[in-house]
Design a protein with these regions (language model features):
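Mobile active-site "lid"/loop adjacent to the S-adenosyl-L-methionine
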Residues: 106-131
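Class I SAM-dependent transferase core
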Residues: 1-29
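Active-site-adjacent beta-strand anchor residues
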Residues: 59, 125, 151-152
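Conserved Class I SAM-dependent methyltransferase catalytic core
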Residues: 13, 130-188
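Short amphipathic alpha-helical segments
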Residues: 70-71, 114-117, 162-164
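Conserved SAM/SAH cofactor-binding pocket of Class I
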Residues: 18-96, 101-112
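A short helix-to-beta-strand connector/capping loop
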Residues: 3-5, 77-82, 171
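Flexible, glycine-/basic-rich loop-and-beta segments that form/coincide
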Residues: 195-201
Length: 201
């Protein structure tokens, strides 16, 4: 990622980290793309997408993150082709909204005994994979055929379950980036949507 943006992170919002940059290094955005940034956080991925794509929708379950993304887009003069919404994954979108590219740097750590105010941005379920599995299932309803889905996963989570969810929902999946960290390995998975199987009556 070579772009530089004027950028602030509000307290209580996930700050861009190694996983954010790993995702941004893996994605390819075309000028004709309609992009959905799920879990937009402070909005760095939304800024990158807005500077390249035809249309961007940015969503986050956290109102604070929605505010943060909106402020950063305004600060960089990138509001004209972006909508920012508070939404729990796809629930706030029109049921027929379709995208050529969807990206998500999800909470991917398994649950532990420690509870913090940032758990919503870090914990992806008991095994760390449950939220990502739900995301992949729901994403298939919002993708055009051959649309690309990018998601960050951790070796600490149940990555086999995530890969199985991709294939069960008609995605052709591959690993496109990875980085070993101190206690885990993070990867970016890319799924290309092949369309729902036709039911023959």
């Amino acid at each position: 990622m070579n772009e530089s943006f004027e950028f602030d992170v509000l307290e209580g919002v996930y700050e861009p980290a190694a996983d954010t940059y790993l995702l941004l290094d893996a994605i390819i955005i075309n000028p004709s793309d309609s992009v959905l940034d799920v879990g937009c956080g402070a909005g760095l991925a939304s800024l990158v997408a807005a500077s390249k794509a035809k249309r961007v929708v940015s969503i986050d379950i956290s109102f604070l993150a929605v505010r943060n993304t909106t402020e950063n887009l305004r600060k960089n003069g990138l509001v004209q082709n972006v909508s920012v919404l508070q939404s729990d994954l796809f629930t706030g979108l029109a049921h027929d909204a379709k995208f050529t590219m969807i990206m998500f740097n999800p909470p991917y750590l398994p649950a532990d005994e420690m509870n913090t105010e940032m758990d919503h941005a870090l914990i992806g379920g008991e095994e760390g994979s449950e939220l990502t599995e739900r995301f992949v299932k729901e994403a298939s309803s919002h993708m055009v055929k051959n649309g690309r889905l990018y998601v960050v996963v951790s070796s600490l989570a149940n990555t086999d379950a995530i890969i199985n969810t991709f294939t069960e929902n008609y995605f052709q999946v591959e690993q496109v980036n990875e980085e070993p960290l101190f206690f885990e390995k993070i990867q970016v998975l890319k799924g290309v949507f092949k369309g729902h199987k036709e039911t023959v009556l």
